[in-house]
Each structure stands twice: as C-alpha cells, then as structure tokens.
Amino acid sequence: NPFLEAFGNAKTLMNDNSSRFGKFLRILYREGHIVGASMETYLLEKGRIVGQGPMERGYHIFYQMCQGLSSAEKSKLGLQPATAYKMLIQGGARAVNVDSIDDAKDFREARAAMTTVGIDASQQWELFQILAGLLELNNVEWKSTGRGSAGATVKGVPSTAVMQAKVANKAVLAKAAELLGLRSDSGPLGLEYQLSMRMNDSASKTGSVIYRALDPVQCRDAIAALTKHTYSIVFDWLIVQINDRLKPEMGDDPQSYIGILDIFGFEIFEH
C-alpha cells in the first residue's frame, strides 16, 4: 500500500524502505471465498518522527510532500525544502536526498492510493496541512525570560502566569498554529502559553489546577511530545479508512480468517 508505506516506512541504515510499525492482517473468509480484510497496527516508532540516527530519515511522507506537491500547493502551505526543517535532518543533510528513493514519484503513488481507499482531495489537503504544521512547529526556537511563576486555573480558564520561556521566532509559531488550526498568541489559550506551561495533575478541592512554567529545553520536549501524539492520531485515522474500505459487504459475515503477523525491524537479510 503506497500511502501506508509513506506514513509508516522510513530509510534506515540497513533498508531504504523499512516498515517502522507492526501490523496484524486478518483475511476474512466465507464459504471458501475472501470477503474482506481488517488490519490492526501497533508499536509505531514515534521517536523517529522527531529524531533519527546518522544517515537515517523520518517517515517518507514528509520528504515526499516537500518534493511532490505542486509549486502552488507548497506556496499555500509555506512549505520549504526538506533540508529547512530540523525535524527532517537529524540523520544529516546527506540522508535527506537518497539516490534510490524517488520521493516525488512515491508521493504521486501515495496520493493516488489515498484516493482509491476513499480519502478525498479535501481530506488529503487537511492531512498535508497537519504535517506541514508539525514541520513548522519543530522549527520553533525558545529563549529564556529569566523569570517564571506558577498560576492557577479556575473553572477551566488558566490565569496568566509568568512564563519562563518565550518563542524567539514568532512568525514560525504563527505559521505552525495557522496550519494546525490553533491560536498562536501567548494568552492563556494560545499555543505559546500551552507549550510553555505544564499542568499539575492534582487539582485542589476548589477545582483549580496549578500551571508551572517550563524552561526552553522543556518547551522543546513539549513540542516533540505533541508532534509524536498528533502524528500517531493521523496514522490511526488512516488505518480506520483502510479498514472501512476492506470490510465485508452487508450479508457477507466472515466465518473464518487467516491471520498474518508482520513485525517491523527485520533488516538483516543474510539468511
């Protein structure tokens, strides 16, 4: 599946198209005939989304977008070359463009496959917006304010506690927030505030929650966590779309299945 590979496969040292998630595929049968299928996935390698080893890449889809989207589409997203994004060059600049990988061609195939399983053009564009937003978000830089304090939330509305870290490149944060459909301001409901404050899990008897100011390193960690969680949700949504397309027709209730377990990580092919 080209688009499942785009979102779940990556270049490693041993394999330029390594699956970085496990899956269990059920091929459903009724009276000796295949009537459908279903897929479960697990153990998506989330760490690879924001960090890669030397000469390795993140998930293909990010590099494919940078190569395969039209100039007009890139302009709408504000998309730059892959080498401009910190999230994509952790493995080194030489790992970004690989001779054995045609990202533009693979992107066209992934896009066509998404259409085949019923993900329409508007849904695809929303996916690209989210992914472009994550790329921008990971280019956000933080600086210390040299101060910081805690604040309380009452009835779900945070107070304006003093932040310990501030965004140094506001335009990048604003672009990321726009693509992700979020507010970028430093007010209590803005993305900058939410990334730079941590909520204390223990609420008081009055229903208030304590927010603690984070330092720049912790803010970067918060962005990494948000990025991994968001990408995981996108990946799970894609699996739902595939299963909806593969499910049996009405009246073709399966009587049995053949299960195929595919575990990622087998990259030594000597035997």
Task: Briefly describe each language-model feature range.
Residues N1-H271:
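Alpha-helical bundle cores of large, well-folded domains in eukaryotic cytoskeletal
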